[in-house]
């Protein structure tokens, strides 16, 4: 685990204390994407992820085709549904904990296949804001109502999100 993973897990652990009774779902979007691809069959191959990795190794000239396939799958309704099902499975657990938050991170690892604004736009039809809130840990900084990925790449999209930590 890298330091940001540890920080997010520590933050989650602090919320589950008996005085809070909050159980947060933490989703590394990149890891979830890899799981999605690994479970997805492709032609006669049981795992699209393994197929794409083998293809990239054996045919470096086909890297563009592999990247296009990754981007197409990252934007697919099936991937969005996969994430939604993970969230629904978590928030519907019946026990003493409240589950009002989903921590989403690993967004930077998805670049250039998927950007945070693209994912949030794709997920908007699924989002049930009365049941849970998605909190995105973003590798960059806010510039007015837009963000700069890795403090380098301008996003040029306006967000309705609220900044939780004052700069």
Regions flagged by a language model, labelled:
Residues 78-95, 123-124:
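A short, acidic, amphipathic alpha-helical segment used as a generic capping/interface helix at domain edges
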Residues 113-167:
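Glycine-rich, aromatic-bearing surface loops/beta-hairpins
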Residues 2-3:
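Short, small-residue-biased leader/transition segments that mark boundaries at the very start
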Residues 25-78:
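Long, charge-dense
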Residues 20-21, 95-98, 129-130:
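Short helix-terminating capping/connector loops at secondary-structure junctions
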Residues 27, 104-107, 137-140:
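Short His-Asn-centered micro-motif
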Residues 7-32, 132-133, 141-156:
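An interfacial alpha-helical scaffold signature
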Residues 96-113:
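Conserved P-loop NTPase "ATPase switch" module shared by AAA+ and STAND
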């Amino acid at each position: 685990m890298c330091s940001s993973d540890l920080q997010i897990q520590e933050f989650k652990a602090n919320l589950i204390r008996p005085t809070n009774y909050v159980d947060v779902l933490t989703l590394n979007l990149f890891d979830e994407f890899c799981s999605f691809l690994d479970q997805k069959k492709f032609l006669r191959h049981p795992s699209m992820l393994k197929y794409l990795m083998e293809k990239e190794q054996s045919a470096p000239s086909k890297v563009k085709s592999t990247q296009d396939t990754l981007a197409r799958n990252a934007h697919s309704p099936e991937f969005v549904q996969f994430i939604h099902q993970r969230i629904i499975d978590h928030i519907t657990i019946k026990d003493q904990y409240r589950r009002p938050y989903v921590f989403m991170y690993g967004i930077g690892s998805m670049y250039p296949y998927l950007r945070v604004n693209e994912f949030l736009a794709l997920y908007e039809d699924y989002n049930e804001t009365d049941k849970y809130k998605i909190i995105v840990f973003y590798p960059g900084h806010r510039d007015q109502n837009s963000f700069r990925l890795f403090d380098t790449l301008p996003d040029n999209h306006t967000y309705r999100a609220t900044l939780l930590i004052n700069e």
